């Protein structure tokens, strides 16, 4: 007899409420958390929580490797990276792999190797994650006391913090070693239009490095985002790596002071909220860095910054009209200010027109034309090189504007223009993720503080309305 319906649809469906889908320590009855509360079920199961974290690391590294190989497979060496929607290859190129003078890609094999290495390590992490989630000990305290912990154990928590800080410090020094000893990194400021070079003369002067932290975040100052030479960036990583490593050792060797024990909440959810806050700050800083900084994120790979594209347009038309006989030093614009050049309130010569708001842009193609008082009129008349004209015309037409449907350029652009800058994607995504992480911080911090104060209720699971409803099956 032909069955009209699959018999399977009459079999009982495992739902949240019939309690039979029980894995020890992972069902609603024993943990107080339903399946959708994710790792909350594992708060007191250090072995299973380790599995979740290792598996998560495996997913992250798998994405990195897979996306890396996807970008390599689609990469066209004749086109700039920023025209191809790439976000991983520009990072590898910035580290000096596979590129030569002017940011030209001469070898894609290092990119392939990077993707394969990430895929292989993701398999190792994936196996470890599955092992610890399904097969390994539920708790580590008994068999591996070094890896065990209790959330309330303040001394153990600061020891774990110290280990993490040391790992971050080692990560910072990996960049330092790459720049110093292992082939160098890409320097967009290298003479003649950018090149890979070893960074030899590090900036270790604390007044310079920490001076960045004391700068105003506003125009012309730009806080740490204003860093514009690699000596400062690599020297900053020496300082940062050293502080992280010494701070990590200090946290391993010491116990929290009394004021810290009183001021902080010591629970798993509190630590989660602190971590989310830190990641949120990182996200916002990364957003500003990739949007404004063309030294750590060279325009050869990521496309021009917004201010850079705007200044490039002013420069391109200055070059054109000067060739046609305009006197760019004295021509007046429709507002009575200089059409091509004007003076800023502090007296230096800057580009006129709407781009005056971006007067503080620094870019390798423009700096040779500056003198002690801003743009130098005699250099603009005599010293403009063809490579500067080509670079600015290219950047003018690749501003980091664009909509979600990939119709790039200004709002009036024709639909045939299919370009969205990686800067737009990276800045927007990091801002949005930073914001979500901040909201998550507020949520978990509020819950952790309420629980510590003793009035955290949550949903009343005994009288939850859904418990009195007919089960789905």
Swiss-Prot record:
Gene Ontology biological process terms, A to Z: photosynthetic electron transport in photosystem II
Localization in the cell: Plastid, Chloroplast thylakoid membrane
InterPro entries for the chain: PS_antenna-like, PS_II_antenna-like_sf, PSII_PsbC, PSII_PsbC_sf
Keywords: Acetylation, Chlorophyll, Chloroplast, Chromophore, Manganese, Membrane, Metal-binding, Phosphoprotein, Photosynthesis, Photosystem II, Plastid, Thylakoid, Transmembrane, Transmembrane helix
One Pfam family named in its UniProt record: PSII
Annotated membrane topology: Multi-pass membrane protein
Residue sites binding [CaMn4O5] cluster per the record: 367
UniProt family annotation: Belongs to the PsbB/PsbC family. PsbC subfamily.
Role played: One of the components of the core complex of photosystem II (PSII). It binds chlorophyll and helps catalyze the primary light-induced photochemical processes of PSII. PSII is a light-driven water:plastoquinone oxidoreductase, using light energy to abstract electrons from H(2)O, generating O(2) and a proton gradient subsequently used for ATP formation.
This protein's name: Photosystem II CP43 reaction center protein
Provenance organism: Daucus carota (Wild carrot)
């Amino acid at each position: 007899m032909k069955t009209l319906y699959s018999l399977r649809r009459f079999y009982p469906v495992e739902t949240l409420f019939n309690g039979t889908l029980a894995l020890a320590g992972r069902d609603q009855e024993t943990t107080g958390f339903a399946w959708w509360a994710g790792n909350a079920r594992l708060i007191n199961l250090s072995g299973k929580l380790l599995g979740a974290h290792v598996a998560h690391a495996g997913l992250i590294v798998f994405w990195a490797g897979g996306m890396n190989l996807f970008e390599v497979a689609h990469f066209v060496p004749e086109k700039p990276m920023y025209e191809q929607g790439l976000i991983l290859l520009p990072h590898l190129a910035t580290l000096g792999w596979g590129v030569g003078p002017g940011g030209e890609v001469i070898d894609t094999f290092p990119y392939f190797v990077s993707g394969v290495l990430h895929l292989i390590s993701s398999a190792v992490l994936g196996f470890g994650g599955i092992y610890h989630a399904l097969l390994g000990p539920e708790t580590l305290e008994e068999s591996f006391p070094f890896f065990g912990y209790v959330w309330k154990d303040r001394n153990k928590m600061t020891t774990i913090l110290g280990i993490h800080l040391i790992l971050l410090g080692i990560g910072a020094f990996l960049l330092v070693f790459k720049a110093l000893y292992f082939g160098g990194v890409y320097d967009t400021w290298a003479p003649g239009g950018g090149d890979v070079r070893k960074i030899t003369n590090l900036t270790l002067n604390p007044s310079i490095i920490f001076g960045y932290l004391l700068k105003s975040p506003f125009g012309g100052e730009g806080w740490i985002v204003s860093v514009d030479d690699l000596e400062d960036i690599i020297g900053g990583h020496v300082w940062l790596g050293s502080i992280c490593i010494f701070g990590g050792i200090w946290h391993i060797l010491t116990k929290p002071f009394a004021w810290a024990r009183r001021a902080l909440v010591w629970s798993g959810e509190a630590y989660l909220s602190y971590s989310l806050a830190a990641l949120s700050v990182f996200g916002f800083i990364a957003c500003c860095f990739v949007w404004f900084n063309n030294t750590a994120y060279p325009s050869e790979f990521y496309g021009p910054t917004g201010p850079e594209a705007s200044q490039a347009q002013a420069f391109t038309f200055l070059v054109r009209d000067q060739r046609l006989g305009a006197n760019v030093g004295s021509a007046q614009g429709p507002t009575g200010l200089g059409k091509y050049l004007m003076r800023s309130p502090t007296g230096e010569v800057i580009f006129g027109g709407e781009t005056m708001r971006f007067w503080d842009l620094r870019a390798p193609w423009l700096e040779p034309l500056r003198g002690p008082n801003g743009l130098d009129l005699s250099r603009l008349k005599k010293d403009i090189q063809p490579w500067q004209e080509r670079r600015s015309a290219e950047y003018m037409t690749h501003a980091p504007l664009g909509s979600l449907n990939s119709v790039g350029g200004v709002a009036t652009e024709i639909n045939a223009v299919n370009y969205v800058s990686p800067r737009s994607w990276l800045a927007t995504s990091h801002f949005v993720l930073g914001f979500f992480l901040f909201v998550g911080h507020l949520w978990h911090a509020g819950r952790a503080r309420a629980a510590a104060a003793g009035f955290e209720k949550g949903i009343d699971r005994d009288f939850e309305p859904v418990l009195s409803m007919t089960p789905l099956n």
